Amino acid sequence: MASRSGLSACIITYNEADRIEACVRSVGFCDEVIVVDSHSTDATRELAAALGARVIERDWPGYRSQKQFAVDAAGSDWVLCLDADERVSDALRQEVEQLRAGGFAGYAGWSVPRITDYFGRFLRHGNAYPDRLIRLFDRRRGGWIGREIHENTRVEGRVGRLRGHLEHYSYRSLTDHHNRMQKYADLMAQSLYAAGKRCGLGKVLFNPQWRFFRGYVLRLGFLDGWRGLVFALVESNYVRRKYLHLYIRCRGLPS
């Protein structure tokens, strides 16, 4: 019979005092909680430490590098990775605990469906759901890869699918959502250009429309009511800004 596996929760933070407590409490079932903080100026570190988390301060190198640092600092081979604006639901916790009891036998990782809270209600359609991510994995067989923005995980071996939700409480307001997506668009354009990617006018004109149509119509985002419409419009603006900035950069102009 397989023995119970150890499990470390890995979280990265910067000025998340209003959300870190709920996040840390949601992973209280783990053997340890690691918080890697990039010099928050609020009470993030103190609040996390008060709940028993092991807090490590580190300069900000980018999303992928910071998340991988947290994984490397884990004391267990199995890790559960989440952001400060995410929480493990009760259903997901129960699933993970059942898997731990069996030592996660036969798997290198598990994907979880992330569900986003948008103005007080979870989005259940469109491009926002189900946002499947590999967040539970054996760090000996996987880790964080990709660019420093829109990073992801990759594991070598069998990946299972969990049903319990990872709850995402990301956007404090419409302005916060808009500003954050504009920031991500600029960073993504810079990353794509540095990687040698190029962009024609067609992507600037048509990719935003396709992103909106796919999410709002094909993936039934309209069933989320006005929230689904607003989310799809902000997404479309993100795609437009990303390709517009890449298009400008490709022509040797400052973006």
Predicted regions and their residues:
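Catalytic-site signature of metal-activated, phosphate-bearing donor transferases
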Residues: 68-71, 78, 89-255
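Short acidic donor-binding/metal-coordinating loop in glycosyltransferase active sites
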Residues: 38, 58, 76, 83-86, ...
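Cell-envelope/extracellular polymer assembly enzymes that use nucleotide-activated donors
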Residues: 6-8, 32
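Glycine-rich, basic loop-to-helix element that forms the pyrophosphate-binding segment
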Residues: 59-74
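Acidic helix N-cap motif at the loop->helix transition within catalytic regions
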Residues: 18-21, 42-51, 91-92
